[in-house]
């Protein structure tokens, strides 16, 4: 479906001043009235003073039109109180329930919310849209709250530098795609719509786990053939789980599936890939996470993906191998050896 992307300036609020939230906020600020909120007032003050987010995007200048706001209610009200506004939650998965709860509790005005996080919730193994729906039901918000996810192959630093990328938006209502395209589809960014919330979220979660596997393979010096095999067979694992959870096969052939997997599994800016490389070098998980300093979602959701695969009775041997290396003391080299010893079968 072709949609017009010519729109008047919108009001947007970003909740979360990490790398991705800051990069996308800076991109949107070129055309819109954008406010960025974060939990650390000192960090926000530094962004305002220097025009950059040195904690997450060092050396990258941000749009001079981007404004920061330390007061949560003031920041949310900027977009939520406008009938055409959009609130973008840029926290990790662990912060999504809190943000949804706080937005749902502001009254009965119409709210439009997108989130940027990828993964499953620890403990419940819920997808982000399931978490949001649970919070809205608990708050009695049966209408007037449109929600969705913006996802796809995108390194924050490249977006902040204005380099081209393409993303997918999937939402609870079709009009949310129009809203996201009006907000972000300009300059070097293209936004494509989808109605498969489950599929795009499964793709965004599983690719992080698979990127750890390809990073380990590369770290062991196993070559490009091995990398291609892991990406391809990993895509098969992603698709099997996605179908079992209610997603559609074609989604995994798009930006939120194979597109995001290729980027995260092969790009040197990928934190999850770096985890795999460092595991192959013999570092412990604690050492790796301390050196990264930022979230590597593949570590957080590997066990959830493996548990869901077991519950759905589907085979995900690469994912299972990643879990064994991360949490059970198996070396990366032994994990590869075990994968190579699996019985022959049809593709």
UniProtKB/Swiss-Prot annotation:
Annotated positions binding NADPH: 20, 39, 118, 156, 271, 295, 297
Record-level Gene Ontology MF annotations: glycerol-3-phosphate dehydrogenase [NAD(P)+] activity; NAD binding
Keywords noted in UniProt: Cytoplasm, Lipid biosynthesis, Lipid metabolism, NAD, NADP, Nucleotide-binding, Oxidoreductase, Phospholipid biosynthesis, Phospholipid metabolism
The protein's annotated pathway: Membrane lipid metabolism; glycerophospholipid metabolism
EC number, as in UniProt: 1.1.1.94
Compartments where found: Cytoplasm
Active site feature: 207
InterPro entries referenced in this protein's UniProt entry, alphabetically: 6-PGluconate_DH-like_C_sf (IPR008927), 6PGD_dom2 (IPR013328), G3P_DH_NAD-dep (IPR006168), G3P_DH_NAD-dep_C (IPR006109), G3P_DH_NAD-dep_N (IPR011128), NAD(P)-bd_dom_sf (IPR036291)
Residues annotated for sn-glycerol 3-phosphate binding in this entry: 118, 152, 154, 207, 260, 270-272
Any single GO BP term: glycerophospholipid metabolic process
Example of a GO cellular component annotation carried by this entry: cytosol
Catalytic activity: sn-glycerol 3-phosphate + NAD(+) = dihydroxyacetone phosphate + NADH + H(+); sn-glycerol 3-phosphate + NADP(+) = dihydroxyacetone phosphate + NADPH + H(+)
Similarity section: Belongs to the NAD-dependent glycerol-3-phosphate dehydrogenase family.
Role: Catalyzes the reduction of the glycolytic intermediate dihydroxyacetone phosphate (DHAP) to sn-glycerol 3-phosphate (G3P), the key precursor for phospholipid synthesis.
NCBIfam families listed in its UniProt record: PRK00094.1-2 (NF000940), PRK00094.1-4 (NF000942)
HAMAP family (alphabetical): NAD_Glyc3P_dehydrog
PANTHER family: GLYCEROL-3-PHOSPHATE DEHYDROGENASE, GLYCEROL-3-PHOSPHATE DEHYDROGENASE [NAD(+)] 2, CHLOROPLASTIC
Name used for this protein in its record: Glycerol-3-phosphate dehydrogenase [NAD(P)+]
Organism for this UniProt entry: Cupriavidus pinatubonensis (strain JMP 134 / LMG 1197) (Cupriavidus necator (strain JMP 134))
């Amino acid at each position: 479906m072709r949609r017009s992307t010519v729109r008047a300036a919108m009001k947007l609020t970003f909740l979360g001043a990490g790398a991705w939230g800051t990069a996308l906020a800076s991109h949107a600020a070129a055309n819109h009235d954008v406010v960025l909120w974060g939990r650390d007032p000192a960090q926000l003050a530094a962004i305002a003073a220097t025009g950059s987010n040195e904690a997450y995007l060092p050396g990258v200048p941000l749009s001079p039109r981007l404004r920061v706001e330390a007061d949560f209610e003031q920041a949310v009200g900027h977009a939520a109180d406008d009938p055409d506004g959009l609130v973008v939650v840029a926290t990790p998965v662990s912060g999504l329930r809190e943000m949804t709860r706080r937005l749902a509790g502001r009254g009965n005005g119409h709210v439009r919310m997108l989130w940027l996080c990828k993964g499953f919730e620890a403990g419940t193994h819920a997808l982000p849209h399931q978490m949001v729906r649970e919070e809205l039901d608990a708050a009695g918000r049966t209408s007037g709250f449109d929600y969705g996810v913006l996802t796809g192959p995108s390194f924050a630093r490249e977006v902040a530098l204005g380099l081209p990328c393409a993303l997918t938006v999937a939402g609870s209502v079709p009009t949310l795609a129009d809203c996201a395209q009006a907000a972000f589809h300009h300059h070097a960014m293209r936004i494509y719509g989808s109605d498969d919330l489950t599929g795009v979220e499964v793709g965004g979660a599983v690719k992080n786990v698979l990127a750890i596997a390809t990073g380990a393979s590369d770290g062991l010096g196993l070559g490009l053939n091995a990398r291609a095999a892991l990406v391809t067979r990993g895509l098969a694992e992603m698709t099997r789980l996605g179908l079992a959870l209610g997603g559609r096969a074609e989604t995994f052939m798009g930006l939120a599936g194979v597109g995001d997997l290729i980027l995260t599994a092969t790009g040197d800016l990928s934190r999850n890939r770096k985890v795999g490389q460092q595991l192959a070098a013999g570092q412990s998980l604690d050492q790796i996470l301390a050196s990264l300093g930022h979230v590597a979602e593949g570590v957080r959701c590997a066990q959830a993906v493996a548990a869901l695969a077991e519950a759905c009775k589907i085979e995900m041997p690469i994912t299972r191998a990643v879990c064994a290396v991360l949490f059970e003391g198996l070396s990366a080299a032994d994990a590869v050896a075990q994968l190579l010893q699996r019985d022959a079968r049809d593709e």
